[in-house]
Amino acid sequence: MFGELQKPHVLVLGLGESGLAMARWCGLNGCAVRVADTREAPANLVFLQAELMSAEFVGGPFAESLLDGIGLVAISPGLSPLEANTGELLAAARQRGIPVWGEIELFARALAHLQAESGYAPKVLAITGTNGKTTTTALTGRLVERAGKSVAVAGNISPSALDKLSACIASATLPDVWVLELSSFQLETTHTLAPHAATVLNVTQDHLDWHGSMEAYAASKARIFGPAGTACVQVLNRNDRLTMDMARPGTAPVTFGTDLPETPGSFGVLREGGMPWLVLAEPDSEAEGEGKPRRRKADATAQEAVPVRHKRLMPADALHIRGMHNATNAMAALALCRAIDLPLNALLHGLREYRGEPHRVEWVATIDEVEYFDDSKGTNVGATVAALSGLDKRVVLIAGGEGKGQDFSPLAAPVAQYARAVVLIGRAAGELRDALQGSGASLVDAATLEEAVNKAAELAEGGDVVLLSPACASLDMFRNYVHRAEVFRSAVEELALSRGIMP
């Protein structure tokens, strides 16, 4: 289970969901376990003590003595190597020659062990990106199931990959396909995972406090395709330069985007008669040798482009998930599933059935011809840009919160194009106001989210959308993004009742 390491004494850093899962897994597989957390009494300590009584727990700042007798460090994804205390401990581990793995590396080693021991060789599909990970992961899992395969969905989406693997082993229900949502934090400490197909949906600024730079952030995302030389089908967003830069030399990635696809097997959008269609590019044998113009090759090879025709799959409006950004998520999911040869017709049936994930451009209510949408999961600038562009309607935007040191200037253009007004909340309200000052949208402050909903309702006109898409984290005003969404929905319900409408 641990590669060349034989049941090492494991130091688990951090006791969140992933840390607890790693401690459980290592203990279950015969390792002595020491767990360290900078908190003296983390919430999961009670579960650790109940489930793994032999584990040693050390609370408080990390000290180098934690490494004494240790053969493997298993680090939780929330711990940044740039944080001084964590960074010093990791440097000391490297100096002692102690490997540092994350949960997904433990998962990858476990799959390799199971294949060697019993021949278990599932397909693995992996998904990352700044925005759209959870929707694409959940949708991919649904499509795999609709195509008749048993599937396990895990990772950043929860449950943890190791907890899910343990449960599958215990119940003798190992799946045909694993669908993994992976964050940049998880990928940073993943070394041997080799998925059959993987996608980076997009890369926009986020978590720079954790990674230190956009270059480091993008490099972590690119680790999803596995070690150099592994045969992973790359599924790339051709509308995103940073993801297309990840194409491996000499390979032809599958691409998706909101334009027409130009390479066989890629997905895109055909606009016909004012209606956008999802389409698949197929080789056009009739075009061979007829002197028809060649399409520009979009992949990384220097081979001559293959003429393609565009097969209509379904109108984008037939999707229950709203917005063109969700259409791109759907195309990424289709591409991943086709990479493991799942039948297209079954996948399209599943696509029509999928109704989306909570708090991701989720419709809440229609009040006096104004629609209210909850995109509380939009915790960065890129997510809000995607929501504004994807809805393609006049919007009153509610934005603000904990800014995380982001540059808000990329919001100015879509706000100018789509927003009637922006209601500003939270700690970053002033920074947002500065960034949007010249956009032409009315900028209004609100002290609370409830006040923001009422002000947005006053500003909106019939046919508009009131969109909560904060472009910020929630912790300055709320417990988390789910709590923020609950407050928003409650405020919308109160607004409906005040106007004599049953929500």
Curated annotation (Swiss-Prot):
Entry-linked Pfam families: Mur_ligase_C (PF02875), Mur_ligase_M (PF08245), MurD-like_N (PF21799)
A single GO cellular-component term on record: cytoplasm
Residues binding ATP: 129-135
Domain of life where this protein originates: Bacteria
GO terms for MF: ATP binding; tetrahydrofolylpolyglutamate synthase activity; UDP-N-acetylmuramoylalanine-D-glutamate ligase activity
Entry keywords, A to Z: ATP-binding, Cell cycle, Cell division, Cell shape, Cell wall biogenesis/degradation, Cytoplasm, Ligase, Nucleotide-binding, Peptidoglycan synthesis
GO terms, biological process: cell division; cell wall organization; peptidoglycan biosynthetic process; regulation of cell shape
Catalysed reactions listed for this entry: UDP-N-acetyl-alpha-D-muramoyl-L-alanine + D-glutamate + ATP = UDP-N-acetyl-alpha-D-muramoyl-L-alanyl-D-glutamate + ADP + phosphate + H(+)
Assigned EC number: 6.3.2.9
Gene3D superfamilies, alphabetized: Mur ligase, C-terminal domain, Mur-like, catalytic domain, NAD(P)-binding Rossmann-like Domain
Disordered: annotated segments: 284-305
Localization per record: Cytoplasm
Pathway terms, separated by semicolons: Cell wall biogenesis; peptidoglycan biosynthesis
Main location: cytoplasm
Role noted for this protein: Cell wall formation. Catalyzes the addition of glutamate to the nucleotide precursor UDP-N-acetylmuramoyl-L-alanine (UMA).
NCBIfam families: murD (TIGR01087)
HAMAP family recorded: MurD (MF_00639)
Family membership: Belongs to the MurCDEF family.
Protein name per Swiss-Prot or TrEMBL: UDP-N-acetylmuramoylalanine--D-glutamate ligase
Organism expressing this protein natively: Cupriavidus pinatubonensis (strain JMP 134 / LMG 1197)
